[in-house]
């Protein structure tokens, strides 16, 4: 680290433990934007810490080759003042009201993979911030960036058809945490951690007082999540079953011609959702998943319960991990909705022995191996889990895990840039599949199929694919789901699969407003 790097001061305070992170989030954040809740389902696992961004120092968003930096406090403003002194002349800087806009050079998309990967890009906005400050105590979350990479971010790096979007979702949207709350369910502890990026004594006093205020609030009885009832919840879609089935059949013809091997078309479902946090609480209870998230932005709210990791990276071991999911069946239930264990096991057996499902799954495992081959040390890739079954409230999936060791000179953001978007949401070959998806879906995907999670200044990254999720704008929900199409797919089954995948979120929203 350069001697000129600015030190980060960490302020920590223990607070009363509460077992329900959703209630805590509601109590502390209410409807404030630039707040985030990230959690996992299994409290027995070591990694089952719930992390909340209570206050953000800065909002960092991107569209095309521009990055917008919006300071949200004096603490965040200090970061901008420091950045302006060190920014490369290759990056243009503009000031618009309280925002600072960084314009990066367009990436030459016909470059080879490595040259493209090392080209100056919008990801360098994060690298600049990280390199400017020094984490002397090596605290794991001194600089904690939490937020969303949208599916459409790929258009910065690859040539894809230009599409219109009817949502305000940026290519990426992240918050640099000023105050974090970390719940540890094993130890039953609650830690308030604040990061100070300035030597301003008044700002330090404000942040210390804010920590005391949060602790005092957690000593109080937690506010209940408000309820909003809706008499009639009308579910609509941008494609009916026939239209979606027709797209599947057209794509199958391209598979038969050999243009692609597999592709994942999707459709959107719409329904009112004036109370997203209540719907999220219902979704957690009905469909607990490895990754659960609730993000409140100035433009949207995003929540979900995702079964699938996008990309995970541990800087200490330099191990990078992908978790392809492909192969889906509904859970075995009786007519009254109760789980039938015998039927459930027979459905699992049928899925495990289905040639189409196995072919599709192994194709995506191979695609994950290829993704890692570009960025990992030769000979370091391996499949640690192959074709096992994960179960959720409405569906079960075939899953595998692929691991490799990241090459020297690359970081977690290089890895994400190389691997996006995940093959289980695109197809194979990946770029060709994404081009066809754009051609047939005809609009931006936004958050769907991108990734949500966090990365830190120490280099660690943990994200999940944004599926089984609800994107809410102006009290209205966009719930998107797709199906993996191969040569011998049955269109009617794939149409039903897309609805089965969307059902958990749809039911949660309905139950929250009943």
UniProtKB/Swiss-Prot annotation:
Residue numbers binding L-tryptophan: 40, 290-292
EC numbers on record: 4.1.3.27
Binding site for Mg(2+): 360, 497
Catalytic activity: chorismate + L-glutamine = anthranilate + pyruvate + L-glutamate + H(+)
This protein's pathway: Amino-acid biosynthesis; L-tryptophan biosynthesis; L-tryptophan from chorismate: step 1/5
Keyword terms of this UniProt record: Amino-acid biosynthesis, Aromatic amino acid biosynthesis, Lyase, Magnesium, Metal-binding, Plasmid, Tryptophan biosynthesis
InterPro entries noted in UniProt: ADC_synthase, Anth_synth_I-like, Anth_synth_I_N, Anth_synth_I_TrpE, Chorismate_C
GO biological process: L-tryptophan biosynthetic process
Group of enzyme by EC: lyase
Cofactor binding mode and count: Binds 1 Mg(2+) ion per subunit.
Family to which this protein belongs: Belongs to the anthranilate synthase component I family.
Name listed for the protein in its UniProt record: Anthranilate synthase component 1
The species this protein was found in: Buchnera aphidicola subsp. Rhopalosiphum padi
